[in-house]
Swiss-Prot record:
UniProt keyword Cytoplasm present: yes
Subunit structure of this chain's protein: Heteromultimer composed of HisG and HisZ subunits.
Location(s) in or outside the cell: Cytoplasm
Pathway stated in the Swiss-Prot or TrEMBL entry: Amino-acid biosynthesis; L-histidine biosynthesis; L-histidine from 5-phospho-alpha-D-ribose 1-diphosphate: step 1/9
Name of the protein: ATP phosphoribosyltransferase regulatory subunit
Pfam families (alphabetical): tRNA-synt_His
Other noteworthy facts: This function is generally fulfilled by the C-terminal part of HisG, which is missing in some bacteria such as this one.
One BP annotation, GO: histidyl-tRNA aminoacylation
Keywords: Amino-acid biosynthesis, Cytoplasm, Histidine biosynthesis
Length: 420
């Protein structure tokens, strides 16, 4: 029964020291940026009832969820998504809208073994609830761009898509559910040959404007020229409105000077079925992995109560950390500047001195050793160059200069004893 006691479950790992500190810093910088832009914080439980994720459209595969039973035999899951629990809160609580919220937490999904994906990831995100207005999408994109800038993430782009356009095409061509799942993979993977064969096998009329748009969809990525091309083939007002929405968002963000951070991809289709309109994905060129995802989900909150429009974006913290590690010098955690060695009867004095010295921005720690030589050895091993000894009647400062030498000796009052 102890076979796995030294191992981590598949898709999980331990984060140590420098990397753990970097994850925390990324989360805090994201949080600070979002709060400065007027977002309110919200937290939901790490565990949720299975029913929260099991509504009709089943946006998350049951096989992807970690399930177990509570004390009453009810099915509980580790949350596989942050947006759906937030929708539960918005649908069951009375909140004034429009409302901007931010969150951060761990998400758990059982990915296939050897797929190269982690089953536990950290997400920080934002949601704009209660307003169906292009300003909400613009606000989300601006917030994420500014947060990535403050993190000094290099070479990133936010792609803007429109799942409503794809849904209009599927509806107009009467493509049923099972066929649609296959079609979706062809378009998402930009598999032009497979898409062409699909159109042939379905005996769709290639002269029809909607079929032409379907066949071109995977190729419609780039700048505003993509919009112009799509508009020519749009065969309904609903399609035209969907395309115009993307155009308005792109133009507004471009005018702010953020044009180099955005692009259009009308062939992008999110795998989560609860998205109803504009969708987003963000990438960093160096790692080629998704760092941002989200979109508009106007029907999701209605599964839990009042129907409320909403749009949001999630930032994949682990991928941001990976990118920062690759594009910057190796991150080094702040080392201890001063170590205080003390006799037990001088603990109060040592702690007062520690509090005094850290006010100057120094990192100060109390020694865990009872023997001064052990403290010296630990200090050398960890590149600590200053040790202060709190003796019975005095304080002694030692500095490493090829050996430990006394730098200063003074009174026991840490008010009068000052280091360099």
């Amino acid at each position: 029964m102890t076979k796995w006691k030294r191992a981590n479950p598949n898709g999980t790992r331990d984060y140590l020291f420098e990397e753990c500190t970097l994850i925390e810093e990324v989360e805090q910088k994201l949080r600070r940026t979002f709060l400065e832009r007027g977002y309110e914080e919200i937290r939901t439980p790490t565990i949720e009832f299975y029913d929260v994720f099991a509504f009709q459209s089943r946006p998350i595969d049951e096989e992807k969820m970690y399930k177990f039973f509570d004390e009453k035999g009810r099915i509980i899951v580790l949350r596989p998504d942050m947006t759906i629990p937030l929708a539960r809160v918005m649908g069951t609580q009375r909140c004034d809208t429009p409302l901007k919220v931010t969150y951060s937490g761990n998400v758990f999904r059982a990915n296939e073994s050897l797929a190269g994906k982690y089953n536990e990831i950290v997400q920080s995100g934002i949601e704009v609830i209660g307003i169906d207005n292009v300003r909400a999408e613009i606000e989300c994109v601006i917030s994420v761009i500014q947060s990535l800038q403050k993190l000094k993430v290099q070479s990133f782009t936010i792609e803007i898509g429109q799942v409503q356009l794809y849904k209009c095409i599927v509806k107009k061509l009467s493509i049923h559910e099972e066929e649609e799942k296959v079609l979706r993979t062809y378009i998402e993977s930009k598999n032009y040959a497979a898409l062409s064969n699909f159109i042939r096998d379905k005996k769709l009329d290639r002269c029809d404007e909607t079929v032409k748009l379907l066949e071109k969809l995977p190729r419609l990525f780039g700048n505003l020229e993509v919009i112009e091309e799509a508009e020519k083939l749009a065969s309904s007002n609903e399609m035209k409105m969907a395309i115009t929405r993307v155009k308005e968002i792109y133009e507004a963000i471009e005018k702010l000077g953020y044009g180099s951070y955005i692009s259009i991809d009308l062939g992008m289709i999110q795998h989560l079925d609860y998205y109803t309109g504009v969708i987003f994905k963000g990438y960093i060129y160096e790692i080629g992995e998704e760092i941002v995802s989200g979109g508009r989900y106007d029907e999701l909150i209605g599964n839990f109560g009042e129907m409320l429009p909403a749009v949001g974006l999630a930032v994949q913290v682990n991928q941001i950390v990976k990118a920062l590690q690759e594009q910057q010098e190796p991150y080094e955690r702040k080392r201890i500047d001063i170590m205080i060695h003390y006799e037990l009867n001088r603990l109060a004095e040592a702690e007062r001195l520690r509090n005094l010295l850290q006010k100057d921005g120094k990192k100060v720690a109390l020694s865990l050793f009872s023997n001064l030589n052990d403290t010296f050895q630990f200090a050398r091993k960890n590149q600590i160059v200053t040790v202060v000894e709190a003796k019975s009647e005095s304080l002694v400062e030692y500095v490493w200069k090829e050996k430990w030498v006394v730098q200063k000796e003074g009174e026991t009052s840490c008010v009068t004893f000052k280091l360099r």
